[in-house]
Regions:
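Eukaryotic N-terminal low-complexity, Ser/Thr- and Lys/Arg-rich leader segments
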Residues: 278-284
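Rossmann-fold dinucleotide-binding core
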Residues: 48, 69-151
């Protein structure tokens, strides 16, 4: 039996159509055997767990909590300890991929916590993380893996935008340049996946600049705490901030920042004095 809750009820329609039961509040899930959570921030997760109608607002707690959000290691450690104090098991298991990856069966996950807990829920995780789930050890180690993953995401998209605009400034069409990159040893699944957006300026949201900024900040915070120098990440964070400045010039700044993070290329182009237009190319 699968029970679900979503802050935006309409987003649960597909699962309800597949047979899941939609509950009215997180507190209605307090008695389940295994609870999976995925929200945007640690603040959101705290509300889901401990708010007035939170999962742990009453006396009951799910037997196993599998937490899949991108949050900091200290926040995760706090939630883990609370779960343990209430007699529950807690597995940190963030994922890599967006909605399109899920539909294509290409989502992956990374897990940390008690190995027996992981073994108990692994087959359930693999139902959605079809590319596999990597167990990396105890505690919050998976949080550091996900933070590092999203730091790479930010550095990659920023540099991809920069070199694409560099090529365009020299006279190379974006679609031609990205075709070359994708066919080269430097191409990747990600560059191929983002090519249609960068060529045709399609900012259908998969991941937003505010969420990327949050994750870069988490990465830099972890770097300070662990004594690791990350100058490229710091520069990427500053470059990203300029996109927020560009957004303030838009008619709908909030709406613009809710668009996909690949729109960063518009800020790079603006700084180069280039006005982007869609190339209207059927690129894969």
């Amino acid at each position: 039996q699968v029970k679900i809750w979503n802050r935006t009820k309409s987003k649960a329609d597909a699962l309800v159509g597949a047979g899941a039961s939609l509950v009215d509040a997180p507190s209605d899930l307090a008695n389940v055997d295994v609870l999976f959570t995925m929200v945007s921030t640690g603040k959101d997760l705290r509300q889901v767990y401990f708010g007035d109608v939170g999962v742990m607002s009453g006396d009951n707690t799910p037997k196993i909590l599998v937490e899949c959000s991108s949050i900091s290691a200290p926040e995760s450690a706090e939630f883990r300890q609370t779960a343990i104090d209430r007699g529950a098991e807690y597995l940190a298991c963030p994922v890599s991929g967006n909605g399109k990856c899920v539909k294509a069966g290409k989502l992956s996950a990374v897990a940390s916590g008690d190995k027996n807990t992981f073994d108990t829920v692994r087959e359930i995780i693999e139902c959605y993380a079809m590319r596999g789930v990597s167990y990396v050890g105890e505690g919050e180690l998976s949080r550091f893996c996900k933070i590092a993953h999203n730091v790479l995401l930010g550095v990659y998209i920023q540099n991809l935008a920069e070199i694409t605009i560099l090529a365009q400034a020299a006279g190379v069409p974006r679609h031609a340049f990205l075709e070359f990159i994708n066919n080269s040893v430097m191409g990747s699944i990600f560059s191929q996946y983002k090519t249609p957006a960068l060529v045709n300026l399609d900012w259908t949201t998969t991941f937003t600049p505010p969420l990327l900024r949050k994750d870069l900040d988490l990465g830099l915070q972890a770097a300070r705490e662990l004594g690791v120098s990350m100058p490229v990440t710091a520069a990427t964070r500053e470059a990203l901030q300029s996109h927020f400045g560009s957004a303030s010039l838009k008619d709908d700044p909030e709406g613009y920042l809710a668009a996909d993070f690949s729109a960063l290329i518009e800020t790079v182009a603006l700084q180069a004095g280039i006005k982007l237009v869609s190339e209207n190319k059927d690129v894969k």
